[in-house]
Every structure is written in C-alpha cells, then in structure tokens.
Amino acid sequence: MKKNFKRRDFLKKAGIGAAAATAVSSFPAPAIAADRIEVNCVATWGRGYPGLGTGGEAVSQRISDLSDGRIVVNHFAGGERVGPLDVFTEVTSGNAQMYNSADYYWVGQHPGWGFFAAVPFGMIATEINGWIRHGGGQELWDELGDEFGLKNFMAGNSGVQMGGWFNKEINSPDDFKGLKMRIPGLGGMMMSKLGLSVVGVPGGQIYENLINGTIDATEWVGPWNDERSRFYEAAKYYYWPGCHEPGTLITLGCNKSWLTSLSKTDQMIIEHASTVQNERMLTEYNANNGAALQRLVNLSLIHISEPTRRYAISYAVFCLK
C-alpha cells in the first residue's frame, strides 16, 4: 500500500494528474498487442483424431499458453488448408510457418527424411530420443533441414506399430507379390522388394481405399488408431509386430527463416511445447493400445497373428540389402 501511495504522490507532484495516470496504467496493453505473433500450423492428421491429431493441436495450444496468448497459432488439420501430404511444401514455400506430420512422408524429396520418422528394425521411441538429443541426431536433422529451409523438433511418438491389415492371409514372402499396400517411408522401400506395389494414401482415405479394393493392405499405427479408423470392417488379417516402424517420430517442422526471426525466448517456447508433447504422446499410446487390442480380439471378426518365421527372416534380409 505504501508503494502505491508514493506512486500517486509522484504523479501529482509532477503535475501529470489523473488522465496521465490512466494512460500510464493502460500502456502495457497496446505494447502486448504490438508484439502479438500470429502463426499458421498445417497438419497431416484430422482434427480430433486420437493421438496424432490431438497431439498436434496440443502443441499449438501449448505454444499459445506458454506465451500467455502472445503467440496465436492457427492450427489447420489435414485438408482444412492444404492436403494432408502437402504440408511440407506449404511450409518450405513460406505460405505457413509450421507443420505437424511425420517426416517419412518426404522421402520423395530426400531419402534421408525417413531416418527422422522410422527405420525398419531400427530404434524404438526412447532410443530415438537419446539419438536425437545426445547422439548427434539433431545435428544431422538440422543439416538435412537446412537444404529445405527447415528447423524440426520432436513432437511425439506413436511407439511400436502393428504390421498391418491384409485382405489375404500371409504365409510366405511370395504372398506379398502383386499386392497393393499403403506403407510410407523406408518401410515402403523395403516392402517393395518383396514384390508388392507401394501406394501413397493419406490416413483419412485409407478405409475407403481398403474397403473398395483400391489397395489390398495397409499399415497405419496401432490398435488405438486402427480401431478408431474401423479397419476391421475392411480387412480380416491383422499382423504384428510392425518391424517397419518400431517407433515413429512425429515432427513439428518450422520454416527456419521465420523461426530465426523470433526472439530466443519465443524460439524456446516453440521447442519446449514440442518437447512436452513428445513425451506425452508416447505415454498416451502406451496407455490406450492394450485396451484397444483387447477390444479388437473380442470382435472375433479378424485373425490377429504373428507372421511366419520365414516372413520375419525375409523382412530382415531385405532390410540389409
């Protein structure tokens, strides 16, 4: 109270009066407004889609929360602003500032992107975290990103995935020949060596393509997401484990020119928001996959099984070629 009285006395003695006091007290509002940053983030996944979609939305909201609303992120789910697989180009061209996706979708731009999402028979989520943070992975990621004007952060991980949904039983490597399968990244490159055709299909269109026969098989994520997408209505055979994706990293990709124009504090806010979601997403998948798998088992409409040993060995052989 004493401090407030002294402030009023000072204003009176200076001859400023009540009007000036009002102006001084309201000064921070226009300063904050002038410093307001509006950002567009484009995502691959649908709004409200468990884990992947909600995770990206959480990152955008957390950036706003950590900045006390000063950074406003307009989050566009897949298809709301650009197509689900067009988010990379939208950010590299500068039309949007951030994307939320998985970097293996960009292997057509450079095969190196696949290493920053999932590698067949590669690292699980915790190993990816260790490599990126302490094993030189972030430096390699930055080097690749520089070629495209990007700076990328870890923003989630779906953990070990399932092997996929098939409309025919797989008993040997020969059973893959001629199949059309939706499988991205390095996993798709590997599986193509088994004689199947790799088809690029956004997540929101998989069910339709699988049920109408446009594709014969698909991998997606794991039981939690696969149940939500109702793949059990479109295919009878559900195989595990997902050797192609032992831990799939989700990315917040930033236009580097835009990011480096921000203050160090704002850059740290964006990185921290991503780091928090990287940990939370993995725990969310671990908490939900088991119960979802049990519900799928209880349906008794599908065959859930491990592939034959020969099939697994073939996976490894082709991975090493």
Predicted regions: what they are:
Residues 2-128, 138-139, 143-305, 309-310:
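N-terminal secretory/targeting leader peptides
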Residues 130-133:
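Short, Φ-rich (hydrophobic/aromatic) sequence segments
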Residues 306-308, 313-321:
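Positively charged, low-complexity/disordered segments
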